[in-house]
């Protein structure tokens, strides 16, 4: 099912997005025209530094176009699908562009762009786009980050309850997780409200030239973030949608921040085609855009026209501002008549708030103290000037500290999810591992027929420690299961088959069919690999025991009958204490070990089976030093007289 405008592309996600977002064919045509006009203007302008513009003359599905380019070896920094894609200049000539794409420099893009009259290519930028200088107070002592939204409305609670964990979202994410960390593809909807004069006098109107200048500023501001990410080995791209002429009864610049829900609700209700409260509409539209563009995250940018406003601010003195954690931010074209900070900078700054970065700038009586923590990893805001410059020992140039659009401090990096807590040079969120769970660790049957084994592979997300989620936020990974492999008795690797036909999500069921084997015992080793290129921390095994058709069945309660071994572990899940019962030949000796999902040993025992043939012991869920282990998945391995027994254990505190 594909709705004309709502982007009903991913079935699980769009089961919740109301098809009222599809609107009419005329609405869809208008949106396509706006995209073409904006793309044509970009094609006639200089590309951001370090990027090359790739033009697509077709109108294919935006997510498919982005995927085609990236599969061909062209990482996209910023895009305005379906026509404009900015790719990194370095290495861009080493691969062949997919069919239908061309570099702007070869003349084809310019020719295509000029088929539509869009005004002069050198249309003036907003007044705030003067040459960049250093202004230590680009917000002139005003707050621009407001507390996170409370998910309290009845319609929104219903959305959340119906949505759950939806197909098409990052693994573990839910409806309201629109910007948890800045890694992957981010959908950015630029919405242009237009007052119709019904309630407030219509004082400002968007012109095509002014609207295009905002889009160019957004491209440049977002390109900064993509460049920062590339320098850290992080894949980050922004896909932009443009929606102009969105009617509202109010003149947005004449309303206070406390009143902005009124005009936002007008704008989004007209766009979506149904009415609801502003908050529900914000998440509905953000999720629809996320689905259309095949993105992991989504942010709404409300551009406000006030180019000739004498004070360049809303009536309460605020100008550009954002809700911490999204799903939207607001940026007037004229921010307090600034002559040093560009509109590019304000967009670059505000989207960081959408991904949980805190301010660091003046005044020193602001709420963004250097002692606060934020973000997926609960990271400190140590570079803040609050309560005084250098109070927490740091004072560094940063785009959250002042007008430093080319500087990103390590504190902000960690707040938006780029933390490298293990110090190996790779951000933790792009080195997550999967886990693999065969349905059985022991399998017995009669030889003479193929054997089908089943199991599940699961991406293991790092726990979300965001304090604004009360440390109970959804644990999310943008990695997915890439493959499951198995080996029989250490032989060559074979590929397991995904039950749904494709390995493309964070949770996958699989089957593996062994050929006809002669009677005997075989060990099947399992490996799961994810899209990070990493495999499970500890391999899992299934012992297959095949007897001749005339041989009697063995006994042992899931253990090898010939060895007389069995292991019981429970309860699992456990709040902490776990009991182990090992049955083995009297006098058997060995070791018991427990590892976490990263392969680190957290517990160890020296084992000797007494004359009763049963060893029984209790573990309190603590490391040797006495520290309590966190909730999570753990792996038990018992090595006894040359045999290995493996079990899985879940601790849930």
Protein language model regions, located:
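Autoinhibitory N-terminal propeptides
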Residues: 27-167
């Amino acid at each position: 099912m594909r709705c004309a405008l709502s982007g009903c592309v991913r079935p699980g996600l769009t089961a919740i997005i109301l098809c009222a977002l599809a609107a009419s064919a005329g609405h869809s045509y208008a949106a396509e025209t706006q995209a073409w006009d904006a793309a044509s203007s970009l094609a006639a302008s200089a590309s951001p530094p370090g990027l090359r513009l790739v033009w697509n003359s077709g109108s294919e599905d935006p997510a498919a176009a982005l995927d085609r380019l990236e599969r061909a070896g062209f990482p996209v920094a910023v895009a305005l699908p379906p026509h404009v894609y900015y790719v990194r200049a370095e290495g861009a000539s080493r691969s062949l562009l997919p069919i239908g794409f061309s570099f702007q420099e070869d003349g084809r893009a310019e020719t295509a762009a000029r088929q539509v009259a869009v005004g002069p290519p050198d249309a003036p930028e907003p007044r705030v786009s003067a040459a960049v200088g250093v202004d230590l107070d680009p917000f002139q002592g005003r707050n621009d980050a407001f507390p996170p939204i409370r998910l309290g409305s009845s319609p929104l609670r219903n959305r959340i309850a119906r949505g759950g964990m939806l197909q098409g979202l990052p693994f573990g994410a839910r409806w309201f997780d629109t910007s948890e960390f800045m890694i992957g593809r981010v959908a950015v909807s630029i919405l242009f409200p237009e007052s119709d004069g019904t309630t407030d006098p219509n004082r400002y109107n968007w012109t095509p030239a002014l609207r295009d200048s905002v889009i160019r500023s957004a491209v440049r501001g977002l390109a900064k973030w993509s460049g920062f990410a590339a320098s850290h080995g992080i894949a980050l791209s922004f896909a932009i949608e443009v929606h102009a002429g969105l009617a509202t009864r109010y003149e947005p610049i004449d309303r206070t921040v406390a009143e902005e829900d009124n005009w936002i609700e007008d704008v989004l209700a007209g766009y979506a085609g149904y009415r609801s409260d502003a908050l529900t509409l914000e998440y509905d539209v953000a999720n629809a855009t996320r689905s259309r563009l095949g993105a992991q995250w989504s942010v709404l940018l409300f551009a406000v026209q006030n180019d000739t406003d004498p004070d360049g601010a809303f009536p309460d003195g605020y100008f550009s501002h954002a809700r911490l954690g999204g799903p939207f931010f607001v940026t007037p074209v004229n921010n307090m008549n600034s002559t040093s900070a560009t509109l590019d900078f304000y967009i670059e700054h505000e989207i960081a708030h959408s991904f949980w970065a805190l301010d660091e700038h003046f005044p020193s009586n602001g709420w963004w103290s250097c002692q606060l923590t934020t973000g997926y990893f609960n990271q400190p805001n140590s570079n803040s000037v609050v309560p005084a410059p250098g109070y927490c020992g740091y004072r560094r140039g940063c785009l959250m500290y002042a007008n430093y659009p080319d500087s990103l401090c390590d504190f902000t990096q960690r707040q938006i999810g780029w933390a490298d807590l293990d110090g190996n040079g790779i951000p933790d969120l792009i080195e997550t591992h999967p886990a693999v769970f065969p349905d059985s660790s022991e399998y017995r049957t009669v030889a003479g027929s193929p054997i089908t084994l089943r199991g599940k592979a699961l991406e293991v997300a790092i726990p979300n420690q965001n304090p604004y989620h009360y440390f109970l936020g959804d644990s999310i990974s943008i990695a997915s299961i890439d493959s499951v492999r198995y080996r029989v008795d250490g032989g060559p690797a074979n590929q397991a088959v995904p039950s749904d036909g494709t390995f493309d999500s964070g949770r996958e069921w699989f089957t593996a069919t062994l050929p006809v084997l002669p009677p005997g015992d075989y060990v099947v080793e399992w490996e799961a690999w994810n899209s990070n290129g990493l495999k499970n921390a500890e391999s899992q095994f299934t012992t297959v025991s095949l007897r001749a058709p005339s041989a009697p069945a063995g006994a042992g309660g899931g253990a090898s009958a010939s060895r007389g071994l069995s292991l019981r572990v429970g309860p699992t899940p456990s709040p902490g204490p776990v009991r182990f019962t090992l049955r083995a030949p009297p006098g058997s000796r060995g070791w018991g070990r427990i590892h976490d999902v990263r392969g680190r040993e957290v517990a160890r025992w020296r084992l000797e089976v007494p004359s009763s043939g049963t060893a029984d012991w209790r573990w309190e869920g603590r490391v040797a030093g006495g520290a309590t282990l966190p909730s999570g998945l753990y792996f038990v391995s018992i090595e006894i007289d040359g045999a290995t027994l493996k079990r899985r254990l879940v601790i849930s505190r």
